[in-house]
């Protein structure tokens, strides 16, 4: 057995794994050499595997699977098969722009070297074969030519994930994915494509035959059903022909009936015309007599009209005289009325004179009764002086009140601004608390309890750090959140252990809330300065230490400086990131931040060299909302001071208001006294003015004296003259009235004559009207008959046209003989024709939904039935041929397949027997004819007390499935020859007993002569395993500084082993 250590990369070192020999025992296509550069964990590494079993052992994360990835990708494998990353660029070592994988494959005519160079920038690969540029297609053709199948789970299960996928395959999937692709040849193992095609075509043909037969049956049934419709259609047509003939005859019968009526009416019309002429001859004399009477009547009416004109003229003159008399009466009344008005005016004048004298007398008495007013003016002057002094005091008070009011308004505005600012602070804090409530409800409930019970603690207690920390710039919140773990971000900070125990007893023990607490140190770590000023680090892009980016209460800041050294962790920019290697070497910083990453450096315990790691920063979640507690407290203090000032101003304003009310009362008293004095002076002046005015009015009334006797005499003379004029008018009126009476008598006599003539005229007109009425009635009867005659004539013409149209005849065309013959067999009256029409229509209506297309469809369907019958017979012959072909192909396919599965079963059973277990493999199907559902069934039994059970993802344990799957793959591998096989950590999950048995089988199988090259990758090994001389063991260590195997002290190893054995005993 050969062993060679495999060490992880160091920068700049080249690793050689294995021995560069063994070419004589290699199978064509085996791997001679694997070279990797900037690939996954390796800077540069070259592996030389042995021809038989190559066991690669190393701790997790050392790079074992990187060798498997190199084999898959170097042989044109897809990244999806590896299941590690979807883009090939991700397989290049971090920080490098390109890398490559190179594989040398053994070939008798000359080894083949395949190189894949991977570019990170464009995620592309460049291929080389024997150091010459090639295409992916050329590589994909070259690899299968060496019998290498990269995507085949049989030679390369590759990873535990792919191995688990294989273990979870169903019977049918196992058959298709393994036997079809990985064992035997297509001719004697896989379900031949031809039998699947024949079976599919046979199914399609059988389905087509079945559908055609069903379709033919439906056609026959439908045609049989429509046969009755055809017969009914012909019955309907016979009824319809009779209806058409009745509809043709009916207009001719209507025409004949109307023509007969026309002849009868034409005869009656001649009789009425003769009688009308006779009555017109008798009416002429009466008309002449009426005209003579009307002439006499007109003469008398003219005379009556003349008398009426004369009477009207006379009456008009009488009316005129009566109007003149009425006018004279009005004039007399006006004179009398004027006399009465003057008498009343004189009486009123005398009354007013008496009243005015009485008023003057009373006012003079009141004026003489008023006291002397000489002492009023000094009192008035004193009142004015006091009034001016009060006004000055009130103005001063108002000025002071205005100043205080303005000052108070300013303070109110400031008070409102401060209150709004506090509200803004509270809103921001509420946002932080709401976020805390959503994500950590227990911590939030503890915060609520703390606010209500702060008096229970002796020292200061700070809320969770995420609430207490306030960023100076929200953009820097991500640095603080990435630096402080979330458990501390949501932790309460105490200054004493005693307070913390009180809090935990209440919150954790009683309320069962899950909260974190920390106790700030007593030493003043928050006051410590960084070892190096930030100015010294600005050349590297650093702009601040972490502590300077936020504010927090002293206990919180003290704890953060103590626990997380926030005062010594600098924050940089993209400039820092671009020169990070220089920063790490020159600054000796243990932690630092760039724009988007956090870097941590430490010294290796082996080499004392600096080792750095970096992580990308997560986005801030809690500290994006900033609340400055000190500023809020300042605003609260300012608000209290403003409220105190407002209270002082209100007290001063109340005092001034009381003084102002006292001055107002004194002012009202002075105003009332001044008003009283002024009213006394005003009243005296008014009395004097009134007396003077009334004396003037009295003088004017005494001067307006009137002589009533003279006025009476003038009125009497005026009335006397008017009475003389009235007497003359009455005399003229009487003469006119006599003349009007004479004319009225003459008019009455003429009216009597006119009445007698009218009576005679009415008698003659009555006789004339009677004759005229009789003549009119006869004329109306004649006109009605004449109109009826014309109507019947037009009706006859219309009916004749209609009858000809019904028979499709021209204006001068005679009725065809066949129509006349058909008409003779039909009824002659309209009632009989209508009755027969209704009967035939009723019968025809029983055949609804029938058209000529029914007959056409019936004929077409009959023809289609013949065609479908011929096609069905033809397909049945084809189906029989397919059955014969499938039977022949089945015999050629199924027997070799059963033989192959028997061989697999022999190998599988042998492997299980060597483990004192039972295993079987057989060909299984539910239905013999469903060839695409043939599957390989694997049944296993691990305990003697159980039965054989099919291998499924649910029945066996994970270790039992791994063992079964591995042995099944080994059974397949005995039948499938390939250059090399790879298994990666398949022993994970196996119990020690099965793992040992499987390992021994792998060693035994892989180390036989003429076997394929084998790569067995594992992170662990059991003790006291059986190894073979032909094995090659490759150890992969976690660094380049491990002791070389040539320098191992084997004697010391043996001594330690003996001591361990002695302790175990």
Curated annotation (Swiss-Prot):
GO molecular function terms noted in the UniProt entry: ATP binding; ATP hydrolysis activity; single-stranded DNA binding
Chief site of localization: nucleus
Function: Core component of the SMC5-SMC6 complex, a complex involved in repair of DNA double-strand breaks by homologous recombination. The complex may promote sister chromatid homologous recombination by recruiting the SMC1-SMC3 cohesin complex to double-strand breaks. The complex is required for telomere maintenance via recombination and mediates sumoylation of shelterin complex (telosome) components. Required for sister chromatid cohesion during prometaphase and mitotic progression; the function seems to be independent of SMC6.
GO terms classed as biological process: cell division; cellular senescence; double-strand break repair via homologous recombination; positive regulation of maintenance of mitotic sister chromatid cohesion; telomere maintenance via recombination
InterPro entries (UniProt xref): P-loop_NTPase, Rad50/SbcC_AAA
Keywords tagged on the record: ATP-binding, Cell cycle, Cell division, Chromosome, Coiled coil, DNA damage, DNA recombination, DNA repair, Mitosis, Nucleotide-binding, Nucleus, Telomere
UniProt region (Flexible hinge), positions on chain: 438-628
Residue sites binding ATP per the record: 58-65
Organism: Xenopus laevis
Subcellular location: Nucleus; Chromosome; Chromosome, Telomere
Entry comment, domain topic: The flexible hinge domain, which separates the large intramolecular coiled coil regions, allows the heterotypic interaction with the corresponding domain of SMC6, forming a V-shaped heterodimer.
Coiled-coil stretches noted in the UniProt entry, renumbered to this chain: 210-439, 629-797, 855-893
Family: Belongs to the SMC family. SMC5 subfamily.
Protein name: Structural maintenance of chromosomes protein 5
The keyword Cell division appears for this protein: yes
Gene encoding the protein: smc5
Assigned GO CC terms: chromosome, telomeric region; nucleus; PML body; Smc5-Smc6 complex
Subunit structure: Forms a heterodimer with smc6. Component of the SMC5-SMC6 complex which consists at least of smc5, smc6, nsmce2, nsmce1 and nsmce4a.
